[in-house]
Amino acid sequence: MSNSQKQNGSIIAIITMFFLYAMIAFVTNLGAPIGVIWKSQPGIDGNNMLGMMGNFMNFFAYLFMGIPAGKMLTKIGYKKSALIGIAVGFFGVLVQFISSFPTGIAGFCVYLLGAFISGFSVCILNTVVNPMLNLLGGGGNRGNQLNLIGGTLNSLTGTLTPMLVGALIGEVTKSTQMADVNLVLYIAMAVFAGAFVALTFIPIQDPELGKVTAETKFEHSPWSFRHCTLGVIPIFVYVGVEVGIPGALNFYLSDTTEKGAGLLENAATIGGAVAAMYWLLMLCGRLVSGFIAGKVSSRQLMLATTCVGMILILAAMVLPKTSTVTMPLFSIMTFSFTSAVVPVSALLLVLCGLCTSIMWASIFNLATEGLGKYTAQASGIFMMMVVGGGVLPLIQGWFSNFMGYMPSYFVYLLAMAYMFYYALFGCKNVNKDIPVE
């Protein structure tokens, strides 16, 4: 194959991975805003922990699929793995759509099954996207840069999803049903179907860097590398922080009881729009960092953003909800900017999106640097740890039931502190003597 053909194949592969990156956020971000609907249903009665169960089931699938997804990658390649992930995703969203027909707890259980199946899909797609972009970029800062740019599209769909769901719900009442957001599920199924057809006809060659064959011998494992082993926990807590901050914020603003933020009209619409601003700032952060990541190391980015993140969360926890600010929002229904008066704490938590925007790619880059042929195996392990995106919000939801929304954010404060520790001390590769070719 000529150099020009290889270059064209790499460009096609990168564009395709960017597109799949966007699909991951679309499906994943359905969990928390749809949880607002189920939380209001009879039998659940405003329980924040149960409201987060859909989000939990989505991420719980990672615990079962993480390592198998990594093995799938090494055996059948990137393209076939992606096609399987897309097909499973279509079926998962279809099951969620079916949950709008049964009523009460029966419908809730069907929805949880659909969220669980969708989790298998996004786990497979995540396993494909991150290592391939890292390898296509040649590792190092360039690999991190591609992941950050791809994450920009991920954040764009992550921004639109809660905004659209919130606009369709309006104000949550006991009559609010899953069928109210069927439009979002139609879009998701159409995207999966279209992507499957498109990817089937796109030629993608697996990158030679890090390629595994039947003759490849694994004398060690990713666990043999200290920086990879210590990087497992930051992946676990990071995903919980990324998903949990806007998810709980959406619950807080949508709650019209005395526990909530005190919004009286269109609370769910405002809650979804504010949560969307968090994802929008993640988009902006990834877009900007995608251009500076080649000059600033992943470690430096992590140290700076975790420090700022801890300050923002702590301030949000201590400020009373009577301290308010007029916050600019975007209305997806009118495609225009508007505003709403929300607690200052909400604005501070939204700003955390700028901090979390670079963390996934940076942690992944730090933890897989120098792994070579063990990269795909490590990716499978990291995909298992994405279950943190379901566990941490569930824990926070449990605490918020009796201690309130804002105090329960201590869960994410502690998570930020550990990520700071990893960037400061734990990310150095001290096992360079292990052969990785």
Predicted ranges, named:
Residues I12-I44, V129-N130, I245-L253:
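Extracytoplasmic
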Residues A106-L125, P328-M359:
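Hydrophobic core of transmembrane alpha-helices in multi-pass small-molecule transporters
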Residues G143-P203:
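Helix-loop-helix hairpin linking two adjacent transmembrane segments in secondary transporters
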